Amino acid sequence: MVPLEAGRQTIRFNVTHEGWNINYFTISVPVEIPSYEEVSMVNRWKNQYLTDDGSGVLKYAGNIDSDNIDAYSWDFIPDEDGYYTIQNQATGNYIVNDGSGFAACMAESGEGDSGKWILRNVSGYTKVTSLLDDTLSLALENQDSQNRVELAEAPDSWYSAHFTLNSTRFDYDIYPDKIVDGPYTMTADNGKELHSTYENNTWKLTKDISELPQFTAENMPISEALYNMALQESLEDIFTETSIHTGEKVEVFNTGANWNKVWTRDTAMSVQYSLAWAFPEQSGNSLLQKIQGDPQEWVEDTGTGGSYPASTDRIILAMAAWETYLATGDTEFLEKVYDVTKYTLEKDFHVNYDPNTGLFKGETSGLDHRSKTYPDWMDEGYFSDIMESKSCNTNIEYAVAFKVMEQASEILGKDPAETEKWAKHFEALKQAINDTFWMEEHGYYSSWQYPEYMGNVLAEKTDVIAAGYAVYFDIATPEMAEKLMENYPLVKYGADTVYPQKTGKNFSAIYHNRGVWPGWEAALMEAAMVGGNHELAGEIMKSIMYGAARNLSNEEVINYETGAGNDAHRQLWSVAGQLAGYYRVLFGMTYDLDGIHFAPYVPDWMVGPFELSNYSYRDATLNLKVSGQGDQVASLKVNGEEKGANYVLPADASGNYTVEIAMEDSGEHSAVNLKPENLVICPELPEMQLEDGVLSWTPDTRYTYKLWTGTEYIDVTGQDSYTIPQNVYGSYSLVAVDEDGIASELSEPIVWNPDGTVLKYEAEDASYNSDCFANSIQGYSGTGYVQDNRPNGGTDITFKVNVPVEGDYLVSALYNNGGDTTSGNYAAIRSVLLDGEDYGTMSFSITFDNAFYRSPRMRMHLTEGEHTITFTYNYNGNIYDQNMNISRNNLAMDQLILEDISTMSVVESPVQLGLDGPETVETNS
């Protein structure tokens, strides 16, 4: 008898007898039948959970009740033949086939085989079949009003009979060679293979990564395997395309397995995290591919409402360009991106800057899937409300661009007045962000602000990109940063992408809502390192490692409850976030103008020593070694010489450097907000009706209610109606609040205009080229509309308006811009002239085809009497109205609307950038 252990064994035969021949041999190793404890059973079809409510019948529910998790938690205990009993953690009851056609929950496991179950793997899911009658399986195919789980003759093709088993423990265990999470174990015996029981598959290192920075962890092979996986997936994400500048073939990054193109924000975030360090050439090439036009500007990708200026986060490319410069020191590259960023900012000041709040308008950066982030009513055929809203994280990206321009202008020897201008813009926008978006009662930033016509009220939710960038880029004050890092909501599998989660028509989609994005939580991870909350950095690093290990790829989205990936493999920002955990956390590197700073953090679940060799930085090659655990540098040696914790590797270093860092625990530990309650989902979106000046609604006794009037919240708990003040402009939205203080989204606004305060003018009665009159699109008012197709053809449209009372007015239009509302890039843009003078820009998202919709509102102060309001294209020789499509910029205008809001006290930010208007700049285009 020879005992055999788990894993690969080597058996040698020494044949000494002439004529002996071994044809075959058999080895039998007993297979250990796994038990699963504290696991939930999640159905594949509708993402429903099995639970025992004590009724005697197995039930299903849409979500786990966080106050009664044990009712959704099960123990699977095998017998010696591999058949399972399934016992509920809360009641102690067993799932039994009692012959009723439905699965029963009983105190005993039943007689004979009635309480025994066969578990089979079907397409990576678990099918639970009765041993008593193996033609019957647990299924949710025929759902009834009592939510009972049936026993059905379910073919393997039924998703309703497929279950995922997930641990209901709110943690998982990381060991040197494996990660264990309930029924799933991810194992690596070396850095070249990693096996996951989730889909019973193995990742293998198949590419040559020897030219890249090499990570070794002799005592923690799973960390080595995950690093190598990230390098391999980085190489798999590189492809070749023609440079738009030189016509030569260049290597660039695509966005992932499903996205074979350079994508603006994906590339920018990935480059900033780590790719600029590990792949500086491909990073620079990728950024330069996101330039277009004359003058040259950064590209906004296709998306919500026709891309720019519904989405305005293209300015994020400036931060990535800066990180690339820090990695390379290439001033020619810096000069190029300086000019591009300068013109982009000039244009954006005209197109989407709001001087009344000191903020830039546009969709949340990254969170660009409309009703997956915003209330459903903002996603109903047009996107004016998203266009007119202001996003915290996008404004932070603008502030970062100002800081980049300040530093770059000094390096490039620009006029000191220009450098000072950028510095002032940074400080002003930083203050506007903090004054506007910071929610002191929550200890973090609001994700976005509703439109001005609603009173600029804040959304009572936050997002991980805003949190991370606010700390990392020095937007938050030190006090804010400390609170934010301690309060930002974490769940078992990482940082909530948004919090709280929303209900609505896209609730079933695991995306921004109910998802963890490794490529976004990495922003909070790097922020936690510079902000000093090492526990937060470690938690996020651990979650990024878990997601890749379980799913055997750096997936884009991880289900925030189950840990399962969304099959978007080797997503670039997830790959880059994984590498950032090694470079920025474990080895503690940050790049600055003076060189590389080192401040490692080794969590107590990481077992060293760790080494990073063949690491290139400009003209130097580094070999980094980190030993010990903790957050404090005990010793730092360079080429054998003690240098101390404040050592900076110079930017002009050349040759070989060995940096050895010994770590110890400082004894200081920060708090993090990691708890099951952070899985919370906000109340359903309320609905209101207006009749005869009275708002009404049907209250839900589970909630309290507050009514937003456009200027303030009013407590309306216990009421089902509210009489509107007749002589005051208002924008009314209802908010439901649960017992834990979690607020719903604002209901669809009902705008009240006092009598005589709305002026309407038909477009066909304005001054325009008569050849542009049209009436083919249905739903217009009057006799038709004006079709203004640019850049080839079209017409200026000039309205004569008669203003009865001086005051502030909201100017808008009814319009159509039919097309692809989710992936087009031809939002219409027009300059607006008041009495022949440039007043700003009005933008028009893509809409559904055969209807007219309300445009964003522009706030305009008008004196009493006659005025002209003109919509024109590229006024006075500028090309601010050129959209991302360039060749299609079409607008059908039906009606001009002026709303007198003098009776409304509009909420304003006290801080403004103080611009007299955009400057004309010369660029090297």
Q: What residue ranges belong to the model's regions?
A:
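Extracytoplasmic
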Residues: 1-33, 727-729, 735, 747-907
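Lectin-like carbohydrate-binding module/patch detector with strong preference for beta-trefoil
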Residues: 33-170
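Acidic/polar, glycine-enriched structural segments that form the non-catalytic walls/loops
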Residues: 167-260, 331-333, 344-347, 409-411, ...
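Extended glycan-interaction surfaces of carbohydrate-active proteins
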Residues: 182, 217-260, 284-308, 353-390, ...
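Aromatic-rich carbohydrate-recognition surfaces in CAZymes
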Residues: 186, 260-267, 271-366, 391-399, ...
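Non-catalytic C-terminal accessory modules of carbohydrate-active enzymes
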Residues: 526-692
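Short, solvent-exposed loop/linker segments at the N-terminal edge
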Residues: 687-690, 919-925
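Conserved aromatic anchor
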Residues: 692-700
